[in-house]
């Protein structure tokens, strides 16, 4: 048996209204995120497949192999060298989220091996059977990262490639990499499968224009998701405080 404590009816109603308002706000945020993600997916398909051309661009696109425009490299096994407060961030399998962005928290090491430089692209080379992360890419923002095993590195060979465009195109075509995964309980990507991936490549100025549009949508979606996480935490804390009478709803 346990005792149930509850406020007077008017305070019950006030608490319910506050939490219901938060629920409605979170629901609307979810709907907005889904809408923005749908817009981004549709626009990515149209822009990256040439179904829609941006105004002022009409030059032909060139079909290229990923291996011809990028140098591919593998990471090393550094799990035994991980330290709590290392100076360098270790790029591992769990360093990239499902949206193809680097996570804020990752393991660290105390050495730099020149495996990664600013503007390199890192790719997930191994995943469990569903393969949802296989081939996902993110861009390295600075020179304080080290590449771990089962992660790949793409480094552009010339200045005619925009790294943001390349990352967007690879992530929009992740189905190719999932199909190329080899194995049963764990899928792995081969160097050949990665280098043979073909990309329709527009002139550099069009790459930049496309990347700017889609990256702006990515930033907007990421901002909305961050706001959603913040309000989820607010609701959780407020729910606890109101239901435990730590915070009382006072009548004005």
Predicted feature residues:
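A short beta-sheet element
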Residues: 92-94, 110-171
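A short glycine-rich beta-alpha junction/loop motif
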Residues: 1-10, 145-152, 182-205
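Non-catalytic DNA-recognition/assembly elements of restriction-modification systems
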Residues: 9, 54-76, 98, 196, ...
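Short amphipathic coiled-coil heptad-repeat segments
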Residues: 14, 21-64, 223-252
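Sequence-specific dsDNA recognition surfaces
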Residues: 67-79, 92-121
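Generic structural signal for buried aliphatic residues
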Residues: 19, 121-123, 214
């Amino acid at each position: 048996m346990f005792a149930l404590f509850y406020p007077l009816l008017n305070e019950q109603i006030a608490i319910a209204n506050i939490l219901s308002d938060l629920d409605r706000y979170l629901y609307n945020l979810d709907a907005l995120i889904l809408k923005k993600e749908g817009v981004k997916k549709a626009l990515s398909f149209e822009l990256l497949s040439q179904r829609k051309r941006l105004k002022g661009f009409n030059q032909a696109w060139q079909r290229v192999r990923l291996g011809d425009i990028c140098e591919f490299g593998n990471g090393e096994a550094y799990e035994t060298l991980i330290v709590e407060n290392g100076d360098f961030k270790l790029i591992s399998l769990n360093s990239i989220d499902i949206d193809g962005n680097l996570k804020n928290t990752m393991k660290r090491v105390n050495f730099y091996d020149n495996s990664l430089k600013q503007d390199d692209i890192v790719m997930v080379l191994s995943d469990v059977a569903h393969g949802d992360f296989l081939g996902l890419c993110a861009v390295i923002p600075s020179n304080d990262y080290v590449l771990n095993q089962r992660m790949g590195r793409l480094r552009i060979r010339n200045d005619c490639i925009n790294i943001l465009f390349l990352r967007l195109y690879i992530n929009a075509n992740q189905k190719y990499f999932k199909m190329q995964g080899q194995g049963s309980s764990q899928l792995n990507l081969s160097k050949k499968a990665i280098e043979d991936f073909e990309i329709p490549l527009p002139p550099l100025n069009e790459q930049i224009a496309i990347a700017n549009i889609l990256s702006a949508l990515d930033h907007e979606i990421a901002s909305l998701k961050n706001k959603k996480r913040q309000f989820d935490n607010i609701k959780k804390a407020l729910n606890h405080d109101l239901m435990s009478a730590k915070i009382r709803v006072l009548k004005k």
